[in-house]
A protein has these predicted regions:
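Arg/Lys-rich amphipathic alpha helix in sigma70-family domain 2
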Residues: 56-60, 70-91, 104-105
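C-terminal flanking helix
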Residues: 23, 27, 48, 120, ...
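Short, charged helix-capping/linker segments at alpha-helix termini
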Residues: 6-17, 27-46, 55-62, 148, ...
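Short amphipathic alpha-helical boundary/capping segments
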Residues: 15-17, 111-120
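A short pre-motif secondary-structure segment
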Residues: 126-130
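DNA-recognition helix of helix-turn-helix
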Residues: 73, 77, 144-168
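Structural recognition of an alpha-helix C-terminal capping motif at a helix-to-coil junction
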Residues: 42-49, 62-74
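C-terminal edge and immediately downstream basic/flexible tail or linker adjoining helix-turn-helix-like DNA-binding
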Residues: 2-9, 13-15, 106, 142-143, ...
């Protein structure tokens, strides 16, 4: 935003507008990362609390939405360390993502969620950001804090693992 309102009210309003534009996507990403709506809610709340407390820094970033997604990924990693195993209830529906090529090819989305949970955290984040959120390799690398080459290799390994896990389920 080029014009910034002064005072706390202005900061709150700017943050609200930002959150309105990114909240659904953050929530979907959080759910796809952890496989549980309640954990996703907590993850998004933690992410937004950190983003708000560092709002000026977030605004100065080249891509504020990428900065906040990076917070989300970091928070989810902390959660994975605490809870190594998450379960996905059968029949759980994933909201339709912006780019649904991969999800639409899977008969039961719960199976996709189960397969995602079988991936190591970094590979899961890469697949979610690249294919389910539709981000480029460059955007994904920026969010994950790694090179595009790392994104490519993590994606390749993840797709091989997903293919194996999904074949085992059929």
């Amino acid at each position: 935003m080029s014009h910034r309102a002064s005072g706390t009210h202005g900061v709150e309003q700017e943050f609200r507008v930002f959150v309105q534009g990114i909240a659904d996507s953050l929530h979907r990403t959080a759910y796809l990362l952890c496989g549980d709506w309640y954990l996703a809610d907590d993850l998004v709340q933690e992410t937004l609390a950190k983003a708000y407390s560092n709002w000026r820094k977030v605004q100065r970033a080249d891509s504020p939405s990428a900065y906040v997604r990076r917070i989300l990924i970091n928070e989810s990693r902390r959660g994975w360390r605490r809870n190594r195993k998450h379960t996905v209830e059968s029949g759980t529906r994933v909201p339709d993502p912006a780019v649904a090529d991969m999800a639409d090819s899977v008969v039961n989305r719960a199976e996709l969620l189960h397969a995602l949970q079988a991936l190591p955290a970094r590979q899961r984040a890469t697949v979610v950001l690249r294919f389910l959120e539709g981000l480029s390799e460059r955007e994904t690398a920026a969010i994950l804090g790694c090179s595009e080459g790392t994104v490519k290799s993590q994606t390749s390994r993840a797709l091989i693992k997903l293919k194996t896990v999904l074949k085992e389920e059929y």
